[in-house]
Amino acid sequence: MAISDLLNRRVRALPEEDEEIYSEESAFEEKSDDRRSGESDSDSDDLDDEALEETDDNSEHDGPVGLEDDEDSEDGEDNDNGEDDVQASLSSISFGALAKAQASLGPKGKRNAKTAKPTEESPQTTSPLDDIRARIREAREQKRQESGKSKDSAKPARTSKHAPMVQSSKRAVSRKRTVVEPPSVPKSRDPRFDPTVLSHGGRHNAESARKAYSFLDDYRSSELKELKAKFAKTKNAEEKEALKREIRSTSDRLRAMENRRREEEVLAEHKKREKQLIREGKKSNPYFLKKSDLKKQVMLKKYENMNSKERTKALERRRKKIASKERKEMPMERRLGSEGNDDGGRKRRRMA
């Protein structure tokens, strides 16, 4: 049991970091030790068989046995006894003791690095895993180099000269940050578009805005009078045409503003009347005017504010407008027939 004592003496503690590293190599070395032990067992069996055959051969011969044969037989017996003792001691050692002894020697790579010198003549054997890793590394490096070359060689170009230019939308974020906000620069303010003015008037309260800017109506009416006077004095045809267009646009603008004001007045009166009826209990729900009813009431209010002469002119103008509209909607034969009735009752025939 001398070998087991020696192995147990050489056992030492290992750090926890090397357990995973030693596991693979320890398994590999255990396999190799098993193979070696198997080979040694087979060799010992072969030697025993040969020794038995030799003894049988010697026994078959009738000649005397010499002193040399006795000495050889004694030496063989001693060797056999020593090998038997070694095998018995090895078989009695537990696997845990063998693993500890193997781990105490350290990993195979570290032992080779410590014992082997760089000037050794024997080349180091490389595992197939290292070869595969080296090949993968080389393939990745080649692929990276090829991709870098392709990126450098490929220049951004348009498909045709008429195609729009392609530009990346990515922009680098500036490293500068505004720590202190600069003072705001005062800007010129137009009261017509000022939000403070529009919040008090404008869309929320059109009536107050109209009262606040009522002086603009006087300016527009005076401007229209000046344009008409200038149109009467000028004699140039081009200037007359330009003044005529300007007078027409100004008068249309004033007329549209007047119509809008009239609509608002009609709506205000209607709402006031409906509220009064609801307050008196004559109605439970208010009645909202339709666009057609609103248009009729606005037209009546417009004619009520006119004098007799203006009213007759406006009615004649409206009658002609409606007649021309109806004539356009009539078919061509009826339209020509109505025109023929004016010429002595003769009807014009359409030539095919």
Curated annotation (Swiss-Prot):
Pfam families on file: RRP36
Signal sequence residues: none
UniProt xrefs under InterPro entries: RRP36
Ranges annotated as biased composition (Basic and acidic residues): 28-39, 130-155, 304-315, 323-337
Transmembrane domains' residue ranges: none
Keyword DNA damage: no
Domain of life where this protein originates: Eukaryota
Subcellular location(s) per record: Nucleus, Nucleolus
Coiled-coil residues: 221-280
Keywords: Coiled coil, Nucleus, Ribonucleoprotein, Ribosome biogenesis, rRNA processing
Record-level GO cellular component terms: 90S preribosome; nucleolus
An example Gene Ontology biological process: maturation of SSU-rRNA from tricistronic rRNA transcript (SSU-rRNA, 5.8S rRNA, LSU-rRNA)
UniProt-annotated stretches for the region Disordered: 1-207, 304-352
Disulfide bonds: none
Residue ranges, compositional bias (Acidic residues): 16-27, 40-57, 67-86
Subunit structure: Associates with 90S and pre-40S pre-ribosomal particles.
Entry similarity comment: Belongs to the RRP36 family.
Function in brief: Component of the 90S pre-ribosome involved in the maturation of rRNAs. Required for early cleavages of the pre-RNAs in the 40S ribosomal subunit maturation pathway.
Name under which the protein is recorded: rRNA biogenesis protein rrp36
